Amino acid sequence: MANAHQLIDCFNDTMHRIQTDPFLRAETMKSKADTVVYPVFWDNNQAAYFAKWLYFDSCDVEVVADTTFSAARKYLRNGNEKKRVAVLNFANPHYAGGGVEHGAMAQEECLCRSSNLYPCLFAPCAQAEYYQFNRNRSDHLFTDRVVYTPDVVVFKDDQPVPQLLPREQWFRVDVLTCAAPYLGEPVHITPSDLKALFKSRIREICRVAMEHQVTTVVLGAFGCGAFRNPPELVARAFCEVLQEELYKHSFSKVVFAIKSNGRPDDNYNLFSKVLGQE
């Protein structure tokens, strides 16, 4: 297992490459400029959205024992120019990249060590309308707001300490940044209300992906690690939303990338059971 010093060095190397490699620097500037925050996506003019959203006869839902970027890369390999893949970043709601500068090991930090996502999250709109907005809130449930960053460049692998990929293996993927509720502090919410909150947040994540004509979305055990949300409840919230009429035709594939520790009660097995993968 990697230690914090190794992960800090890796992140510093990632940032150095972003700042000094002409290609990465240019791509980062573009993705940062194109980053957008969706405060509340839904409004009364639903027909305008339906007109440009993609429609699929069916959606293939899959649970894989994999990391986020590794799963995304596999679904980009078939050369289909119409395929657009987005991944969900399990955000720290207050600070871009969470504890990546200090060697933290959660999902968001892993994404930031392997790609140019971190500087993109410092887009002025993201800082003002997402991070500052959440810092101004007094609860730990946070918000349905989503930050959308297109064409993030992944240029390191997903080893415990990510290593530089050969340049011909670099790839682009869109990133949806959103925070789950945090149950590590006392929160007065019933299981049914928590499930309803998750379903609302999941719908917003899906709508933003649909707005950008994403065909494959890579999700995961959203909020079920450091944020201490019950994985079976979260999995059922995802399952129920993806069975709703609007969302069951909105993507070609939905992938839940969840690393497995081999225990029968781990997040991978719980999500597999709920989503019918066993």
Predicted features along the sequence, with ranges:
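Macrodomain-like recognition of ADP-ribose-binding/processing modules
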Residues: 1-217, 221-278
